[in-house]
Amino acid sequence: MDKESKPQRLYVLQARNRNHPLTCREQIKNAFKDLREVPVGIDLREQSIIGVVSGGNREGAIDVLRLLAVQIAYNNCYTDVKLAAVYDEKKEVEASSLEPLKWFPHCWSTDKKTRYIAGSKDEAREVFFDLSQCLRDRFNSDKDNVSFSTHYVLMLTDKEYLEGELIKSYVDSKKNVGLHTIIVADSVTDLPNEV
């Protein structure tokens, strides 16, 4: 073992009554009840809206959003997942974290005419319009539980960007249209009711 590697922890569980299987099960459950510094998996197919609560640390929440985008792009082909990000370009933390996503091929429309990155409300309208065009046929389809070849992940640094926009009806819809929305909020009460 080299000097810099840390030894692994070994948990030894002592069963009071070795004949009773619930004793060991409860000890295992209690030993691993709280896990710290481990990756958390999110199945976007199961969740249409996800909230990232900053709890006063907005920079940390934006960083989580950026890391999610990078991991989604790294693990999925740009033809399978399209990423869209809407942020406030006037806020340095948001702009420095999310603006570089524009270089990902995942952030382009399939016809390569629209980049799904917006730093202002006007740019957001263009992104929302293009996404709405893509999702309209899916929404109007009579089929339920359809698996889509392309999924769209919409990342918002504020839920207010959705107000008055057509895409809000797709975000709020219970119908699966292949749209997954991740919203950053300062507290749980700032998230939409659907989260």
Per-range role (PLM):
Residues 1-195:
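Accessory regions of macromolecular translocation/handling assemblies
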